[in-house]
Structure formats: structure tokens, C-alpha cells
């Protein structure tokens, strides 16, 4: 079998139809590479050739590189990998310079290697489909476009214009591609697509790439051009400020682009291959491919969903509480076409919650991303009410009131009598054990936790929490609903704080411990950023609010005392108590916390924090390791204790729910990639120096002895 069908028509035009065997999408796998080798030799041997057309037999044009292959590439494979990449690119370059017109007939999405094939053609025609996406997203997986994407995008767009598409992996549709000059024409269907490709070849028999024409200049100039040189002088520093040195891919892309712009095309392609090999054989790309590709795909395929239970769809959803979380859940549900009953204690409160959806939808309309009619249609799906009777017939009701067990019990009992037969009652709680909340329900088998993250419209993750008696059917329905509204579910078992809130708390606590130890707050925040966290722990604590943290600690302490246990006091408790009760600094919402929030200026760390500051010789690496290890070790404890049931959910949940450094591939993958044996030793060092919270869990010790990764 061949991944490329070779057909020569009566006009001596060769049509290459891309058709990977046994796959729904075309990829640059071994079969494709062998097939490209074969067709390139065949094309070179043609005595009568008028042109070449690349087209696809799949629903899309081409999906990109084979990530299953890429994740296996090790440093010892570097030479073979480099040669393989160079050979593939050599074939595309040969076809590009055959001396006949080459056309890409794009019937759908072309990403990564697929877009690189298209770029190696002289003319690109796409079907006018708003769903089609083009671009080079490799950077989001710790890689760079290694099939000529950097070289050709820079030569077609110029360095500055190409950078956002290369270093941020921005994807774009047909209209944007046309405005950039990357798509030259459109067609309405596959037949017109082929007809236009043939017609263009006949009309342009002497075609070649613009950058292969003698005297061609890169748009905007090359790195020696004064205006470009001025930008490039500060670009690396700006990039470093953004990546904090955690992500080698954007740096490699910038280097390959700038170096490649100063040499001929073939040398530039070789430079690109070297940087690509460096990234592909490195650890960070493996971390990111493992989680952002394989992990997310496993979750999409229902990895933690009970098997053999029919797929389910919610048809009417009730949301109790129209505050920030309830309003966000109502919006996320309605925008997917599901009717929502948004209930609060008064119609006025419920309408305020609905107004949140109006605000978000109005913004979409003003940006041209939605019609006014569509906005009105979505808003009509949200019924704001104070009457529990309006919940009649809901097959899912989500309680989203304040974190208070008595209040949650009250609204649950009021609402669940209106559930449809076999309906599901859910609680959006971030800390309260679901089994305890389920006691208020008439059927704890149909009760489950759905922990959304704020702001709901932007946060992709939903943590599904199984109570002690939650049935498999209820879990399957919850999983299906989360996917129905386009979000990513992870599944955990019940415990205080579950997984995400519990581990997230360790990050914030570690930041405040460092402050209590006397470390300058700016050093703490910078260490977190250098670790790869999106925001520093003190800034995050302000967002959460110190009063909420104090309240949760108080509730936890009471609950543990009722169980005959104690929550030991720590230096963090003193920091929080002082800020709230002595200094009246309660967080961002109150206008003052660890940071000051001037009305007309940027937030900045409050100078009064120097009351905790003393000489502290802690190294930056120790701070970075404390921040990463404290979360990773507690994640491992969650897995060991059965709170988490899968490493995939641990890694995906830690990144999308906690903000754990994405370069690591997640909290457990951080330990794997660190080296299990080394991770155990480092944890022991940190425990000896900073406290027992760094003591390696038994599972880490066991895996270190067995020389196995945690899987």
C-alpha cells in the first residue's frame, strides 16, 4: 500500500492524492515518507510533465507529524532523525523546484506538516469552509515546524509577520489566509477545487516559488535591514521575559528564523532541521506531547468514563445560585444550545446572573464573532427565576451556592424533587466532601460533584468527584455533560479538597511559607514564574482572597476536630491572620492584600510586607524546587491514596486546574522526567532542610527501587 496515489491525466499533470492507510487523517509517518520518496523519484523520471497537484482523499488535507513516532525519538537517535528529516524536506524541495507549477488543493484543515506541504507548493487553493484551519501549532507541543515551515513562512511573510504564527502556533481560517496571501484562491467544492488547480497550472506553465526568483527580497527586510535589526536586538530579551527560560521551542524558532533569513533556502532548511532535531530529542517536547496530545486525546475518548454505558445528553439543566460560578455555568451550558433554569433567592439576583451571559455574548457580537440573532437565541435559553417549580423536568441540576454545608443541603432538598426520572443532582464545590453533601439528597447514587473553575467561560477543566455511593451511570452522565459543553473532564474520588483544590493550596501555602521565613516577596513571585507557574503564589492568594482561605481553613479544622483529628497551625496562619485582622488587607476584591491595587496604575507588591523580611540566603533553585516538588509530591499522594485513579487525570488536571508548569507535562510527569531515583533523593534533601511535607511518598520510593516511571 502507498500513502500517496499517483495519477497522470491527459494534460500531463500528475495528481498526488494523499491517503494514509488505515487512518482517518493523513500524517507524516514512515509510510508517508516512503511513499514521498517513491513519487519524487517517479516525478524526476517523467519526460512529459506539465504540473503537480497535491490533494487529499481524507475529510481534511493533512493532520501533521506522527506524534507517536516523535515521542519515541531519543538523543541517541539524533543523527538518524536529522537525516530522515533532511531526506523528507529534500523531496519536497525537489518537487518545488522541478520547473513545473505545483498546486496544493486544500479540501480542509492543514496543520503542521500538512501546512508545510502546502507551503512547498507555488499556488494554494482552499475550499471555502469556515471550519478549515491552517497553521503551524508545533510550538504548543514543545517542537518547531521542521518540514520547512519556518523557512517558507519567513520568506513569504517576513520575519515580524511570521513570528506570531511560528512562536505562538496561531491557527487561522481561509479568510485570514487569503488576506495574508498564503491562500491564493478558493473553491466551493472538491470538483471546483481540482478544476481550478488544473486551470491554474495550464495558465502558469513557468511557475516557481517567489523566493526562488533571482533578486527576491524577504518582506520587511532581512536581519541586516536597520528596522528589522532594531527589533531583533530586543526580541530575545522580550521572549525570555515571556518564557522565563522554561520553553526552548520559541527560542529555537526565533534562532532558526533569524539565521535562516541570512542564507539561501537550502542552508536555511538545514538550520531548521538541526533545531528541530534538538527539540525532538529533548525531554520537554516529550512531556508536552504526552499530556497535551496523548493525555487530552485519552480523556476525549472517555479514559475515565465507565465503559458499556450508553452516551447521554442533558436536555434541560438547572443551576442553583446565580453568583459568579452559577452565572458562568449557565453561560457555558446555554452557549452549547442547552436550556438552563438559573435560580436564585430573588428574580433580581437571577437576572443579574443572566446579565453576565449577556455581557459575554455582547462582547462576541461587537468583535464580529457572533450575530445578534445568535446572541438572542442563546439568551432565550436561560430562564432567570426565584421559583423552584421552574426546575421541573431538569435532567441535571447543579448547585453552585456558597461553600457552606447547611446551605448546600437546603437548596439540594428544595430542588431535587423536580428532577426528571433518572436525573442527576450535582454540587459545584471546591472543598466540601461530596459524600457528606450527598447525605442531604434522597438518592446519593445519583449525586456527584462537578467542580468548575473560575472564570467558567475561559477555564477548560471540570473536576468530577465521585461520592462513596455515586453510581457508574451517574458518573457516565456527568462525564458526558462536561464533554457536551466542550470542557475537559477528570475524575477523582471524594476527599477534602479533592485533588485540584488540595494541591493548589500547597502552592499558595509554599509561597506564604517562604514569606514567613523572611524571603523577599519579589523573589518568591519570580521563582514561581521561573518554575513555569503562570502567576506567583502571593498574586494568586490575593485573587482567591485571604478571607476565603481563612474560612476554608476554619471549616477544615472544625471538620477534622469532629473526626478526632487536628490541623496543625503553621507560620502561614500567622501571616493570614495578621494581614486580615491587623492590617485589613483581605485580597484583590477588597482593594489590598499582598499587593496594592491603585485605581489608575498597575498592581505592585505592598511595601509593608517587609515586616516579615529578613536576610535569607535560600537559593533560587531551592525555591523553584520547593514550588514544583510540594505540588508534585502531594499529587502523588493523591494518586497513592486513591483520590486520583489515573496518571493522565493527574497530569491534565494539574496543568489545566492548578496551572502547574506546562513544560513539565504535569505534576506526576515532572517526577518521571526528573528521574524517579533523582526525584526521591531531591525530595529527601528538601524534607531534611524544609520539613516533612517533602518526605517522598511510599510509591515514589517503590518506583525508585524498581527503576520504573509512575504510570
Please annotate each region the language model reported:
Residues 91-104:
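Conserved catalytic cysteine-centered active-site region
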Residues 104, 108-114:
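Gly/Ser-rich catalytic serine loop of serine hydrolases
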Residues 1-55, 79, 84, 90-93:
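Conserved CoA-thioester-binding segment of acyl-CoA-metabolizing enzymes
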Amino acid at each position: 500500500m502507498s500513502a500517496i496515489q499517483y495519477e497522470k491525466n491527459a494534460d500531463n499533470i500528475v495528481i498526488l492524492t494523499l491517503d494514509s492507510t488505515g487512518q482517518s487523517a493523513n500524517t507524516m509517518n514512515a509510510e508517508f515518507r516512503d511513499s514521498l520518496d517513491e513519487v519524487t523519484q517517479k516525478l524526476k523520471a517523467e519526460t512529459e510533465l506539465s504540473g503537480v497537484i497535491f490533494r487529499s482523499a481524507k475529510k481534511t488535507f493533512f493532520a501533521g507529524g506522527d506524534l507517536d513516532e516523535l515521542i519515541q525519538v531519543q538523543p541517541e537517535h539524533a543523527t538518524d532523525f536529522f537525516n530522515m528529516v533532511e531526506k523528507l524536506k529534500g523531496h519536497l524541495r525537489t518537487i518545488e523546484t522541478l520547473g513545473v507549477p505545483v498546486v496544493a488543493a486544500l479540501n480542509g484543515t492543514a496543520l503542521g506538516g500538512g501546512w508545510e506541504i502546502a507551503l512547498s507548493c507555488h499556488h494554494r487553493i482552499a475550499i471555502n469552509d469556515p471550519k478549515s484551519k491552517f497553521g503551524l501549532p508545533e510550538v504548543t507541543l514543545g517542537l518547531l515546524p521542521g518540514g520547512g515551515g519556518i523557512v517558507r513562512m519567513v520568506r513569504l511573510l517576513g520575519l515580524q509577520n511570521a513570528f506570531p504564527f511560528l512562536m505562538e502556533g496561531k491557527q487561522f481560517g481561509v479568510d485570514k489566509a487569503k488576506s495574508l496571501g498564503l491562500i491564493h484562491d478558493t473553491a466551493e467544492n472538491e470538483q471546483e477545487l481540482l478544476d481550478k488547480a488544473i486551470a491554474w497550472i495550464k495558465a502558469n506553465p513557468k511557475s516557481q516559488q517567489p523566493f526562488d526568483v533571482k533578486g527576491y527580497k524577504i518582506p520587511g527586510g532581512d536581519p541586516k535591514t536597520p528596522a528589522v535589526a532594531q527589533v531583533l536586538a530586543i526580541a530575545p530579551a522580550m521572549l525570555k521575559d515571556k518564557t522565563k527560560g522554561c520553553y526552548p521551542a520559541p527560542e529555537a524558532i526565533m534562532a532558526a528564523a533569524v539565521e535562516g533569513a541570512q542564507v539561501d533556502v537550502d542552508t536555511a532548511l538545514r538550520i531548521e532541521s538541526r533545531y528541530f532535531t534538538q527539540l525532538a530529542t529533548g525531554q520537554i517536547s516529550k512531556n508536552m506531547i504526552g499530556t497535551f496530545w496523548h493525555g487530552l486525546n485519552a480523556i476525549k475518548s472517555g479514559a475515565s468514563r465507565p465503559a458499556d454505558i450508553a452516551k447521554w445528553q442533558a436536555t434541560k439543566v438547572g443551576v442553583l445560585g446565580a453568583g459568579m460560578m452559577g452565572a458562568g455555568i449557565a453561560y457555558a451550558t446555554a452557549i452549547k444550545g442547552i436550556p438552563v433554569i438559573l435560580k436564585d433567592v430573588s428574580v433580581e439576583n437571577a437576572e443579574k446572573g443572566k446579565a453576565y451571559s449577556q455581557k459575554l455574548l455582547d462582547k462576541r457580537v461587537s468583535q464580529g464573532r457572533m450575530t445578534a440573532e445568535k446572541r438572542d437565541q442563546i439568551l432565550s435559553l436561560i430562564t432567570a427565576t426565584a421559583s423552584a417549580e421552574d426546575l421541573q423536568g431538569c435532567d441535571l441540576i447543579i448547585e453552585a451556592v456558597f461553600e457552606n454545608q447547611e446551605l448546600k443541603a437546603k437548596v439540594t432538598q428544595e430542588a431535587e424533587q423536580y428532577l426528571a426520572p433518572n436525573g442527576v443532582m450535582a454540587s459545584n464545590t471546591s472543598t466540601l466532601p461530596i459524600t457528606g453533601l450527598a447525605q442531604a439528597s434522597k438518592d446519593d447514587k445519583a449525586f456527584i460533584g462537578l467542580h468548575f473553575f473560575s472564570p467558567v467561560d475561559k477555564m477548560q477543566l471540570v473536576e468530577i468527584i465521585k461520592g462513596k455511593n455515586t453510581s457508574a451511570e451517574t458518573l457516565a452522565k456527568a462525564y458526558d455533560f462536561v464533554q457536551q459543553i466542550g470542557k475537559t473532564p477528570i475524575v477523582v474520588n471524594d476527599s477534602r479538597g479533592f485533588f485540584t483544590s488540595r494541591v493548589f493550596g500547597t502552592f499558595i501555602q509554599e509561597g506564604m511559607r517562604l514569606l514567613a521565613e523572611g524571603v523577599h516577596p519579589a523573589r518568591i513571585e519570580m521563582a514561581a514564574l521561573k518554575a513555569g507557574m503562570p502567576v506567583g503564589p502571593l498574586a494568586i492568594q490575593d485573587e482567591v482572597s485571604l478571607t476565603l482561605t481563612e474560612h476554608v481553613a476554619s471549616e477544615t479544622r472544625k471538620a477534622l476536630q469532629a473526626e478526632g483529628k487536628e490541623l496543625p497551625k503553621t507560620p502561614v496562619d500567622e501571616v493570614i491572620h495578621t494581614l486580615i485582622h491587623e492590617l485589613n488587607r483581605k485580597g484583590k476584591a477588597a482593594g489590598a492584600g499582598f499587593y496594592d491595587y491603585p485605581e489608575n496604575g498597575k498592581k505592585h507588591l505592598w511595601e509593608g510586607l517587609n515586616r516579615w523580611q529578613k536576610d535569607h540566603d535560600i537559593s533560587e533553585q531551592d525555591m523553584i524546587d520547593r514550588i514544583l516538588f510540594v505540588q508534585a509530591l502531594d499529587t502523588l499522594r493523591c494518586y497513592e491514596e486513591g483520590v486520583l485513579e489515573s496518571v493522565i487525570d493527574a497530569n491534565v488536571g494539574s496543568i489545566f486546574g492548578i496551572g502547574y508548569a506546562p513544560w513539565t507535562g504535569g505534576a506526576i510527569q515532572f517526577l518521571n522526567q526528573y528521574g524517579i531515583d533523582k526525584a526521591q533523593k531531591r525530595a529527601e534533601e528538601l524534607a531534611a532542610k524544609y520539613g516533612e511535607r517533602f518526605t517522598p511518598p511510599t510509591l515514589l520510593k517503590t518506583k525508585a527501587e524498581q527503576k520504573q516511571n509512575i504510570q
